[in-house]
């Protein structure tokens, strides 16, 4: 007989990911993402001076994707920010968390706020057909579009509407073990690449270390995701972020591309755009994934005048062909 604990050990074994429309109920180990926490009486005030969102306006039952920028308005990282325990927490890509935290802490010595990485808490994604019903058998209350965050003892649950309903579970070890014991045999299991694939489909920007301090928030559609407040007080990089809006300085946007390729590009790679008989290098890859059906999906920052008629390809891959896919939101200024 298989020992339950070894059968469902984290991280889960990697399978090729599925598009949201093809995905069966799946639990996803989010080992490529990492958590940080902030507690103390000055936390809201301190964060207000560091991130693009209006932290004071974030409700207890809400979460927001915002950016932490350098003085030039370039993003160290984007952060999924929410209330957690006695303070706040945020989730970002693991490969840049330590650098981002050291930047975030630079001025915290003058504030009553404690900022720390948290690797004891477990991050799990839950997505696919019937996942709400399965989670409802474990948790007495689940978040939804109107109340996107629900707190339980040892568990913070985040709701995402796109590309199809999914959940991000922020769990203490005990609730995590209990969840896996109850649902482990009723769901598929996969690793971070499945969640990354859903983020690409949803147009949620992925900032890895290769692209840290490279882009202003608007180049990754953060304004369209309500991640930038243009009415709050000062924060690091605000002047450049505001200039991009009011002077039309931003000429880039985030795109979801799909098609065929012989290789999956890496974060930081450029792509090629077809111009008649020729191909011209363009853009920057943020993330990419090869799906179960062989398709390759790419999330890239490109000139914001691209449209569905444009054809792109992975650099130096003559057989590659990628086209622009519709995002579930309008790109605004």
From Swiss-Prot:
**Sorted UniProt keywords:** Cytoplasm, Folate-binding, tRNA processing
The cross-references to InterPro entries, in alphabetical order and at most eight, read:
GcvT/YgfZ_C, tRNA-modifying_YgfZ, YgfZ/GcvT, YgfZ/GcvT_CS, YgfZ_barrel
Instruction: List the GO biological process terms.
Output: iron-sulfur cluster assembly; RNA modification; tRNA processing
Gene Ontology CC entries for this record: cytoplasm
Which GO molecular function entries does the Swiss-Prot or TrEMBL record give? Answer: folic acid binding
Primary localization: cytoplasm
- Location in or out of the cell: Cytoplasm
Q: Which family does it belong to?
A: Belongs to the tRNA-modifying YgfZ family.
Q: What does this protein do?
A: Folate-binding protein involved in regulating the level of ATP-DnaA and in the modification of some tRNAs. It is probably a key factor in regulatory networks that act via tRNA modification, such as initiation of chromosomal replication.
Protein name (Swiss-Prot/TrEMBL): tRNA-modifying protein YgfZ
Q: Which organism is it from?
A: Pectobacterium atrosepticum (strain SCRI 1043 / ATCC BAA-672)
Taxonomic classification: Bacteria, Pseudomonadati, Pseudomonadota, Gammaproteobacteria, Enterobacterales
